Amino acid sequence: MERETIKDVLRRLNENGVRYCLVGGLALAHHSIPRVTQDVDLLVLPEDLPRVEELLKGHELRGTSVALIFKIGETRFDIIPANLRSKRQAVLNAIDETFEGETIKVANLRNMIFLKLWASSERHERAKRAQDETDVIGLIELNPEQVSAEDIEYACRTLLAMAYTPEEMRKYQAKVDWLNGVLDELKMADRKYQPLS
């Protein structure tokens, strides 16, 4: 990845009023988890996607059902539509950080925990699922003073609200139970998700 290319693209998004936030490896780095990453993952509000396509015209590799993929030089950008309320909230609640002197938007800790928890629930590849779980643990363990019981509640409630079928509810509940177990191991049981009965 070319840092100058990343800075230039993010600057152009900022200058053109594109509402986005970094997620993925670069966002994890801003939350104290060093990660070697091969791409730049950006959540973008759906109504801003045409502007992104115009700004990056000529660099599109392909589109998938999940993302638009652009490559500039050696840097790949995965543009992910924030087409669900939870993803939209991640963009709207993004925090300002600095990258190479440029102010950028990064998903906040609460939304990163949710996004990684959700990703780990949806992955079919065991290695990627395990990496997402490791990321959730790292986000909490490396930021213990910033992670509140309210953040955990938000992540768990938002995940459970994604369920449309009994099977999905069981899957997401298992992930919430896993997270509560992690909090026990980290001696943070006071932050466990405990739904109101």
Where are these regions (language model features)?
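Compositionally biased terminal segments of proteins
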Residues: 1-197
